[in-house]
Amino acid sequence: MTTPDVDGAARFLAGNARVLDRRRFERLFSGGDARPVRDAVAAFRNSDGGFGHALEPDGRTPASQPAAVAMALGTLDEADAWDEELVAGACDWLAANAPAEGGASFVEPTVEGWPRAPWWEAEEGRPASLFTTGQIASTLHARRVEHRWLDGATDLLWRRIDDLDDPGPYGFRGVLRFLQHVPDRGRAEQAFERGGRLLFDRDMVALDPDAEGEVHTPLDFAPNPDSIARRLFDEATIEAHLDHLAGGQADDGGWTFNWLAWSPVAASEWRGSLTVDALRTLRANGRL
């Protein structure tokens, strides 16, 4: 069993990661305070209450974007750096920029003209994204936030889940995040029992830890022992993927990713973010 080198990860982050992820590591693994994480997140905030400035490294526009809001709220939550002012502003921005059907788009048109990954293109009509909407709604429900945007997003997600057929792996990850924390637990369990097998029926998950390319693993869908989708995988499969994750630490101390590295800066920022994520997953599963 590979034992991750936490000190090596710390050195990698010190030499390669942005302040945000260095502060995340400090908070989560070195007993650091929550306030520096809050302040690091706030540095990406705009006057409209949303978040931008490449907080999500693949969209390098200064304008507020839903994916950046999702990352901001998730970071505040994980570090227990929850800030009512930042959260209220983000929710107000979401409400002011919601698609007609509710929720949040994946990419807003304000990305136009700025460096971005090839998949960061605003769709015509600004449809709601299961991925961003599910992530944001999940975090807000976990924190028991009440806001009109969340009410509309929850209704939208339930409608989409009731007719779920082929959401794609990212969309399904958003659905699972939502089902993890939405207050109506009975409905969430029923929805999961109906739709959980789509993970296999639509070939969204790679069960082989050595699968190559931009694949999604069981740990992407069920990173923690209490994840709603963990029951879909046997213990041997989870342990094999944990072994693979632990063994994925590079010689420089960091972890990397399996999608297109379209920008050296974005790649470095993603590696910093995902290094902290990898350590979190390994610790949650008893590997640290």
Task: Place the predicted regions along the sequence by residue.
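Preference for long, amphipathic alpha-helical scaffolds in soluble/luminal domains
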Residues: 1-288
